[in-house]
């Protein structure tokens, strides 16, 4: 069994490795609330387009 066959052969059905940002495919800093599945960096860029507004 070569290294190419072993790489990423472990099933990722749960945990951080199973979820990714729908914009940039990153696994870190994911916001899952309300089914967003967007990382926090992309959320700051797209928040106004999605409909989130900042109130003071």
Swiss-Prot record:
Enumerate the Gene Ontology biological process terms.
cytoplasmic translation
Q: Which InterPro entries match?
A: Ribosomal_uS14, Ribosomal_uS14_CS, RIbosomal_uS14_euk_arc, Ribosomal_uS14_sf
Q: Name one Pfam family in it.
A: Ribosomal_S14
Q: Which domain of life is it from?
A: Eukaryota
Note whether Nucleotide-binding occurs among the keywords: no
Q: Where does Zn(2+) bind?
A: 21, 24, 39, 42
Say yes or no: keyword Metal-binding present. yes
Cofactor dependence: Zn(2+)
Q: Entry's Gene3D superfamilies?
A: 30s Ribosomal Protein S14, Chain N
Q: Provide any one GO MF term from the record.
A: structural constituent of ribosome
| Co-factor remark | Binds 1 zinc ion per subunit.
Q: Which UniProt keywords apply?
A: Metal-binding, Ribonucleoprotein, Ribosomal protein, Zinc
One cellular-component annotation, GO: cytosolic small ribosomal subunit
Q: Which family does it belong to?
A: Belongs to the universal ribosomal protein uS14 family.
Q: Which NCBIfam families match?
A: PRK05766.1 (NF004424)
What is the name of the protein in this document? Small ribosomal subunit protein uS14
Upper taxonomic classification of the species?
Eukaryota, Fungi, Dikarya, Ascomycota, Saccharomycotina
UniProt gene name: RPS29
